[in-house]
Amino acid sequence: INEATKYGDVIIGLLTDKAIAEHKRLPYLTYEQRKEVVQNIKGVCKVVPQEEWSYVENLKRIKPDYIIHGDDWKTGPLREERVRVFEVMNEQGGKVIEIPYTLGINSSSLDKDIKAIGTTPDVRLKSLRRLINAKPVVRILEAHDGLCGLIIENQEILKGDKREVFDGMWSSSL
């Protein structure tokens, strides 16, 4: 964000719960809560919903002069999206500026920290309700024991540029 302010007003495309749920687990904070946090960061002028994993629709609608992105998308699941972003920005006469990715600051490490703290049945129930509202299909797998639960929690599959995970697990004590 600090680097982006050098180029003009900073508009953040923030993924909606629905967009996130298509690729990974639902975040702990709702879209509105995350928006509140992001719009109060120094340098951010506006936060717009990003309804899809792809940046393309927002780029076509907003037509920015620049898009600033960490260079972590040169490899991995976002590399195809990077190509599309370059194409759209070139068509619109804009420029993509890649800056060094900040190691250690990401949602995955935050997720690990929150998991270490634990949760309550009430929090899990509220999360399930949000998840059902955010996704057309919720992926739940039955766990026989703690080891199965750990596998379910950490299993992920890459399909092209899309990462799929189980949204939750269920255990029966028949």
Residue ranges and their predicted role:
Residues 1-120:
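Nucleotidyltransferase catalytic core that binds NTPs
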Residues 121-174:
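Alpha/beta enzyme core
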